[in-house]
Each structure stands twice: as structure tokens, then as C-alpha cells.
């Protein structure tokens, strides 16, 4: 009888372990990578830092080779002060700004730092990277990399651009299947778990085939092969956790029936829906429209896609439990023409906008439509008349 009880107990433990592992897969660790031109691999975006000749106060500085320097600060929550000091110096008084100092250990001073030499210089640009920074966190030191591009044409156009220099990537298991996972610090602030209503402030995650560009916002949830998971991302990007989402509250969104695809994002993550009769469901929360699409065929059977994107706060909406939120988006769209006098010549540009001020593009067969838009110019006395193609901006 005791043996039978042991067998039943072991079976119960085994079933419990299986049930637990099916719902929550634990920490799945990723590997850190750095690259000089990381944007070619991970996409991402740059951030512009203001530079000044004013020396910061109460900061120990390194020895310089010239009389003037430029100073900047990079904001990151990974150091106690919330900012990392950066200095640009140059080898000679008339040369490029080819030396960069950064507070790589986050101690608030730069007198203990060595200069990073530029790997490329042009007439106006200087390139650095990947530049290593080490954050001290509870579990020990964490390595992070940045790439820099300094533009120095004149006082009006001078700026320091900062790019991602590293990312996390590796193989994870989702519902028993191996998939590639990539984490990107999209807003370049040193952390990998940022969630936001504004897409530019949300970090990015890819789960699927290696090399896939199907990118989602880091958020509370992520959909993988039509299954909704709760997502947890380590602040430093070292691991993720996926748990099958349960007891999630949903509401509906109502769109014009012409909309064939709709996407919206926020702290819940990014959700893309193939629309049916203008109705789709989303988890309860606040969102901003990411894009909409309308697909049509012309009388010759050619496929066309109109896409609205680049929404401001006018594209914000909220989904409430068991309620329906209606959005008037899509058609009609408005085409505008702008004229600007440049010297003795006029320059013309077009813009196509949706009802919420979003940009609108038109593609056919997946390719941008070139020379679709045309402008007719005619002199007041009628002696001159010509049709000009207007390229997409």
C-alpha cells in the first residue's frame, strides 16, 4: 500500500510539473552581441544629443589635446545619476573631432577614462563605436555598447547622434518549438523592457525564424502563432519569460468595413488584426494606432494597398471590457501640394494625409508606386504648360 501511495504521489508531482511547465516556461536566457553597424542587423533608431562648449561643474575631466571640447549627456536609468557624461576632443586644433570620452563605469567622472578613437572621419562626420559601457546592477556588472556619429558642419547643424551598439539574441522554446528571439533597446536608453503608448519609447522583440523582420513592441503581452502570452523581459535584456495568458479581459474595436488590416500598440504590446466586417478584439487597455491598410483591385485586376501610419496622440484610444470602441479612420484621404521659393526657383512637394493627420502611402504588388502623382504647371498668360511627376517623399 505504501508503494502504491508513492506511485500515486510521484504521478501527481509529474503531472503538476508538466502543467506548470506548459503554462510558464521560466527564464529563457539570451546572448549579448555588439556590432559597429548594429542598425543593419536589428533596425532601431537614433537619438540626437545636444552638445555644448560649457564645461560641466563638479566633474573630474581627463586631459585634452586641444583648447576646446564639446560636452553632452546620455540619459539612462541604469546609473544612479540618470545620466552619463560624454566629451568630444580632437587630436589637433584644425582637425576632426576624432576623440571621444565617455563615463563608461557610471561613477560620474571622466578623469579615469581613456579616449575612444574615431574609426572613420569625413568632411562633416566622425564615427565611433561600438563604445563599451558597464552598468553596475544588483546581480553584477552588465555590458552595453553604443555607436556614435558626430555631425559638425556649423553651429546651427552640429549634433551628436547615438545608436544601438548591442542587442540580445538566442534560441528559446515556445510551446515545445524552437524559435529565435531578438531583443532591441529601441529607444537607446540602456534598458530592454520599456513599454509605452508612444512607439518610439517602446523597446522591440522578435520571436520567430532567424532573420525575420516581424517585430513587436515589448509589452505586457505578445501573440505567437495566434496564442496570447504574458511577456516578462529582464531590464538588462538577459532573459525573457513567457506564460500563456489566462483570464485576460477583452473589448471590441469597430472600424469602417473598408479597412482590411489594423494595428495598434501600447503598454500591452503591439497587436495586428486582419479585419472582418470591421470588428476585432483587443485586451483592455490604452493604445495608439500603429497603422491601417485598405486592399483593393482595380478593373484590370491589379492589387493596390493604401496604408496610414505615423499617428500622433490623435490616434490614441481605449479598449474597455465588453465594450465597443469606434474609430473613423481610412477613407477619405487628402492630398496636398506645397510650394516653396528657393532663390529664383520654386520647389514643390506633396503630402497625403488621413483624417487624423497620419501619413498615407500607396503601393501596388508590395512595391512603392513611382510617378503616380503628377503636377500640371501653367503660366498665367498660357504660354507655358508642362506636367511634372512628383515622387513620394
PLM features: residue spans?
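Exposed boundary/loop context
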Residues: 5, 16-17, 101, 169
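Sec/Tat signal peptide C-region and signal peptidase I cleavage site
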Residues: 20-24
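N-terminal secretory signal peptides that target proteins for export/translocation
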Residues: 1-7
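Bacterial N-terminal signal peptides
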Residues: 10-19
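Calcium-binding acidic motifs and repeat modules
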Residues: 25-268, 274-381, 386-393
Amino acid at each position: 500500500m505504501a508503494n502504491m501511495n508513492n506511485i500515486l504521489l510521484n504521478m501527481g508531482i509529474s503531472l503538476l510539473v508538466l502543467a506548470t511547465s506548459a503554462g510558464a516556461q521560466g527564464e529563457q536566457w539570451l546572448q549579448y552581441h555588439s556590432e559597429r553597424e548594429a542598425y543593419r542587423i536589428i533596425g532601431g533608431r537614433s537619438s540626437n544629443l545636444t552638445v555644448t562648449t560649457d564645461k560641466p561643474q563638479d566633474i573630474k575631466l581627463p586631459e585634452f589635446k586641444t583648447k576646446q571640447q564639446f560636452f553632452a549627456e546620455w540619459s539612462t536609468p541604469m546609473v544612479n545619476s540618470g545620466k552619463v557624461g560624454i566629451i568630444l576632443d580632437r587630436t589637433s586644433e584644425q582637425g576632426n573631432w576624432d576623440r571621444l570620452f565617455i563615463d563608461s563605469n557610471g561613477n560620474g567622472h571622466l578623469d579615469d577614462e581613456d579616449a575612444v578613437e574615431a574609426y572613420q572621419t569625413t568632411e562633416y562626420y566622425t564615427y565611433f563605436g561600438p563604445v563599451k559601457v558597464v552598468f553596475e546592477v544588483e546581480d553584477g556588472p552588465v555590458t552595453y555598447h553604443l555607436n556614435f556619429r558626430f555631425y559638425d558642419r556649423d553651429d546651427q547643424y552640429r549634433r551628436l547622434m547615438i545608436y544601438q551598439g548591442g542587442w540580445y539574441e538566442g534560441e528559446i522554446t515556445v510551446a515545445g518549438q524552437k524559435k529565435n528571439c531578438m531583443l532591441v533597446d529601441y529607444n537607446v536608453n540602456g534598458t530592454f523592457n520599456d513599454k509605452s503608448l508612444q512607439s518610439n519609447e517602446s523597446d522591440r522583440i522578435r520571436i520567430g525564424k532567424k532573420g525575420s523582420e516581424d517585430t513587436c513592441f515589448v509589452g505586457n503581452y505578445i501573440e505567437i502563432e495566434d496564442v496570447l502570452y504574458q511577456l516578462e523581459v529582464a531590464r538588462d535584456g538577459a532573459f525573457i519569460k513567457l506564460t500563456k495568458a489566462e483570464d485576460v479581459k477583452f473589448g471590441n474595436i469597430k472600424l469602417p468595413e473598408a479597412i482590411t488590416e489594423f494595428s495598434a500598440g501600447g503598454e500591452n504590446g503591439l497587436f495586428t488584426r486582419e479585419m472582418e466586417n470591421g470588428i476585432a478584439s483587443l485586451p483592455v487597455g490604452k493604445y495608439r494606432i500603429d497603422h491601417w491598410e485598405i486592399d483593393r483591385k482595380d478593373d484590370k485586376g491589379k492589387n493596390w494597398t493604401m496604408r496610414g501610419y505615423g499617428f500622433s496622440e490623435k490616434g490614441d484610444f481605449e479598449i474597455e471590457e465588453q465594450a465597443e470602441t469606434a474609430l473613423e479612420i481610412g477613407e477619405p484621404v487628402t492630398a496636398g501640394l506645397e510650394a516653396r521659393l528657393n532663390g529664383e526657383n520654386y520647389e514643390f512637394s506633396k503630402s497625403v494625409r488621413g483624417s487624423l493627420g497620419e501619413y498615407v502611402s500607396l503601393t501596388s504588388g508590395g512595391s512603392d508606386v513611382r510617378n503616380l502623382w503628377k503636377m500640371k504647371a501653367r503660366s498665367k498668360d498660357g504660354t507655358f504648360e508642362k506636367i511634372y511627376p512628383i515622387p513620394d517623399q
